[in-house]
Regions:
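Fe(II)/2-oxoglutarate oxygenase catalytic core
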Residues: 1-154, 162-185
Length: 185
């Protein structure tokens, strides 16, 4: 039986990943439109990261991201044909840098009762850099699965509670991802 976690290595070109990281760093020094997440203790994890929404801050890279995702999504849909019966779209391209010991380590699902997340059906994520073995893994509690970040790998998984997950900490490097959601139309 499938765990519905689609992992597609080398699906995003190295050059694209490097441009995404460079653009995030550039935006972080030239604009205030980024979102800085900082939460300490209180059971909420230790979140310290910076994110930019490229559909607002860099439409060219956002469009390129969607083209790359379309190719990998076609493979995922071949493996899960029932998904093709739904109409859905992705409009958010969130690019995120997590520093050593930062991140959001609390178990969570991407679909919730709030209007902004209620219609999320599928999560996508692109690892933009490698992390050392055992660092920065994405962990799924129900599936007992841990994914090691590897540059260019695209991951898809359902947004519902069945795929409750967390990002495990990096200790020796920064972790870069692009992420977003497919929404039911």
């Amino acid at each position: 039986m499938s765990d519905f976690i689609g992992v597609y290595e080398n699906a995003a070109p190295t050059e694209y990943c490097e441009r995404m990281i460079a653009r995030l760093e550039e935006l972080d020094t030239t604009t205030s439109s980024g979102c800085r997440g900082e939460v300490a203790n209180g059971g909420l994890g230790n979140r310290k990261d910076v994110s930019f929404y490229f559909e607002r801050d860099d439409q060219v890279l956002a469009q390129e991201t969607n083209q790359i995702l379309d190719q990998a999504l076609a493979k995922y849909m071949d493996e899960h044909p029932a998904l093709g019966m739904s109409q859905f779209y992705s409009q958010v391209v969130k690019v995120q840098r997590t520093p050593p010991k930062g991140g959001f380590h609390r178990w969570h699902a991407e679909q919730g009762s709030e209007l902004s997340s209620a219609t999320r059906c599928l999560v996508w994520m692109i690892y933009l850099n490698d992390t050392p073995e055992g660092e920065g893994m994405t962990e799924f509690i129900e599936q007992g699965t841990r994914l090691q970040p590897k540059q260019g790998t695209i991951v898809f998984f359902p947004a519902a509670w069945t795929h409750t997950h967390r990002g495990n900490p990096v200790y020796t490097c920064e972790k870069y991802i692009a992420t977003g959601w497919y929404y039911l139309a």
